[in-house]
């Protein structure tokens, strides 16, 4: 018999399912979870950006021995750094859009950067911060003269940026929830 069959919880159960009254700081929230007398059976992290998508929360959940669903610490951390993720993907032989990674680019060298992008990637291209969640700081650049603004935007989020060729086609995202015996 399944001990969790027909088990339910609602938002009034110690406020654990409701953000009201809970700490907004992820570390304080995890401390709250660790000390709760009726801690959840499993956490479904639905967080965005640094601390939420980079493996930090997953690592802290592991430290306090609270199970969670989704990607683990290593997968989350590796995917958050777009430059590192591309290195891993291409090393595994998986095709990925061509890209240029730039650390602390100097905006006075924009002519050189624009020439390099035109030669190696072409336009349109995408400029994005290396470490940001979702599409935060991402710009589509259709013409070389728009590159400066896109680089400035990406640099406002991270000192390392990626400039990536545009790929035409469908984008498909797949979330997988499973176990060792799918």
Residue ranges and their predicted role:
Residues 50, 75, 103-106, 133, ...:
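Residue-level detector of flexible, active-site-proximal loop/helix-junction positions
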Residues 67, 95, 160:
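Residue-level detector of anion-binding/catalytic polar loops
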Residues 1-69, 73-74, 78-84, 88-91, ...:
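ATP-binding N-terminal substructure of ATP-dependent carboxylate-amine bond-forming enzymes
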Residues 89-90, 117-138, 159-168, 172:
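ATP-grasp fold ATP-binding core
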Residues 142-182:
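Phosphate-binding site of ATP-dependent enzymes
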Residues 47-50, 100, 130, 166-167, ...:
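Anionic group-transfer/hydrolysis microenvironments
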Residues 111-116, 140, 144:
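Charged helix-capping and loop-helix junction motifs
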Residues 96-101, 125-152, 171-173:
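Glycine-rich phosphate-binding loop of ATP-grasp-fold ATP-dependent ligases
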């Amino acid at each position: 018999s399944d001990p969790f069959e027909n088990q339910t919880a609602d938002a009034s159960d110690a406020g654990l399912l409701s953000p009201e009254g809970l700490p907004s700081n992820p570390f304080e929230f995890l401390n709250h979870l660790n000390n709760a007398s009726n801690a959840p059976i499993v956490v479904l992290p639905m967080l965005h950006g640094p601390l939420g998508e980079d493996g930090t929360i997953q690592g802290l959940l592991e430290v306090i021995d609270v199970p969670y669903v989704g990607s683990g610490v290593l997968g989350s951390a590796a995917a958050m750094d777009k430059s590192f993720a591309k290195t891993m993907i291409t090393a595994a032989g998986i095709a990925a859009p061509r890209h240029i990674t730039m650390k602390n680019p100097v905006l006075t060298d924009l002519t050189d950067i624009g020439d390099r992008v035109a030669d190696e990637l072409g336009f349109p291209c995408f400029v994005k911060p290396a470490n940001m969640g979702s599409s935060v700081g991402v710009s589509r650049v259709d013409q070389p003269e728009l590159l400066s603004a896109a680089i400035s935007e990406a640099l406002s989020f991270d000192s390392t940026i990626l400039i990536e060729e545009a790929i035409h086609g469908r984008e498909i995202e797949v979330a997988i929830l499973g176990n060792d015996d799918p």
